[in-house]
Amino acid sequence: MTGHAEAAPGTLDIDDVSVLVDGRPLVDQVSLTVSAGEVVGLVGPNGAGKSTLLRTVYRALRPTSGRVLLDGTDVWRMPGKRLARHLAAVLQEHAGDFDLTVYEVVAMGRTPHKRPFAGDDADDRAIVTAALTELDVADLAGAPFDRLSGGEKQRVLIARALAQRAGTMVLDEPTNHLDLRHQLDALRLVRRLGVTAVVALHDLNLAASFCDRLSVMQAGRVVAHGAPRDVLTPALLADVYRVEADVTEHPRTGLPQVTLLTGHDLTGQRQGVAQT
């Protein structure tokens, strides 16, 4: 692989992964295969284990048992720099603020492709500039990262992952802090890149619109997996989320659309009005 080559989409295998903390399973025997170029959404209520599972993929947390394989190689056996050339992560939390400009943060995405102590070359600068433009933060290039709003920081971190040119992406609530336009832009970008992606999302309608398949997590386990129209059913939403909802086909897109019935409890007793 050349220094500036873009990694091809890889196959990601989560093989019987469990994570135990103080004897309690946060992730419980999860297996999931994401084919090259496929976008799989992780959905489920808070505390279901989505973020914990993703941390095992981008190697922030070692599984108690099981393996995570990228193109057949255990990610824990890959040199860090090699893994970073092939896998990029966008996290929902910002681990402290960087004492760097926006440009410098995005340029960090080029680090896996450089020799030690090497500076940016023309290709690096072009890639960083393109990523800044793609995420609509080019006008912030010289601004201190730590002075940005939450949404601006999120877009910068997505731009950093884009500059990494990895073939596989892990995104934990990438639309967190983003307004509606930038939520759509971010997920459209993931689709357009053609990368292999696992995306944790809370918005079920966004998940149905942009993901090839959904894995529904509950209490650390995957309880349903498949195409959005097969997975998102009123019965599943009642069981997993404890809400009553209608799931209909959107008349323009043909995709499943979830409408929460905020005026009903799970027994169907009228309490108020319905809301999309």
Task: List the model feature ranges, each with a label.
Residues 107, 122-140:
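Conserved ABC ATPase "signature" region
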Residues 66-74, 83:
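Conserved ABC transporter NBD signature motif
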Residues 43-45:
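The feature captures the beta-strand-to-loop junction immediately N-terminal to the Walker
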Residues 58:
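Helix-to-loop junction immediately C-terminal to a conserved catalytic motif
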Residues 234, 238-276:
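ABC ATPase nucleotide-binding domains
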Residues 169-173, 178:
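Catalytic Walker B motif of ABC-type/P-loop ATPase nucleotide-binding domains
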